Amino acid sequence: MDNSVIVSLRDIVVEFDGQRILDGLNLDIHDKEFVTLLGSSGCGKTTTLRLIAGFLEPNSGKVLLKGQDITGVPPYKRPVNTVFQKYALFPHLNVFENVAFGLRLKKLDEDTIRRKVRDMLEVVGLKGFERRSISQMSGGQQQRVAIARSLVNEPEILLLDEPLGALDLKLRKEMQLELKRLQREMNITFIYVTHDQEEALTMSDTVVVMNGGKVQQIGTPEDIYNEPKNAFVADFIGDSNIVDGVMHRDFLVSFSGVEFPCVDRGFAREESVQVVVRPEDIEVVSPVEGQLVGVVNDVIFKGVHFEMHVECEGREWLIHSTRACTPGETIGMRIGPNEIHIMSRSEG
């Protein structure tokens, strides 16, 4: 994978009606990666996408493309195409003409247009649909047409603004894999916006977690999930148990009144820390085998596991386990060294 930086945002500030949407944002996006901007509504992720597309100019700061300042360059002069949640397809044009639209604006000859459109429809799995009316296409097929229309122009960067939001769950999961396949096959940069954590973890090479107009953490899906930088990321990416603890020395932490071996180091002796434990990383055992002992408050069957809320040492723990327990049952809880993640309280 090419590791060169294709897009850089430098000290970006965006304000709407006196409200700061992006607050000194700095971000590098690497070429030929699938990068996801992840965050809740209002975090600034779509504003960031619009800046890259050229639909919006910052109040201050710069947008760089391969080191060149493109802050004031209009969208049609940028090597960028955008796919929106509302696909904005032309209902009066068939599939072929929708995909060919941008090529016709470039005044390419008919043979070239025909070849490029047919090649692209084959890539997105719509070969043979050239003359189909848009109104006869399913939601997933319409999305493929929108993607084909963007990719046929051979952009260096494809921007995707929550394009799966209108699809049902099964189709959304299928399209997640399809988008990742397309990105690898086309070998270009995809920048994807979503609030869906699972979507981000499934598709991305790099995840950018945003909150309050700032980047909270950048990393691989594995890093973001297993090594959250702060309490916001730990809580936003999947379910987490976040408890106060004390780091006695390297590889030894205490929380909930019990000392636990861990794999973390580099903290001050007796430093107050926050401890993150994922629900699936807690082993349910008998009370005599448990490092912690708690009482099950409630149990919900989730299909692949049981979700339990367990009262222990004055706080409620969330546990995902394949073992079925009953409300009121006393259980033991074991947490291995590799399942404990330590964060400085200043990071939380």
Residue ranges and their predicted role:
Residues F34, P75-Q85, L89-F232:
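ABC ATPase nucleotide-binding domains
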Residues A53:
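Helix-to-loop junction immediately C-terminal to a conserved catalytic motif
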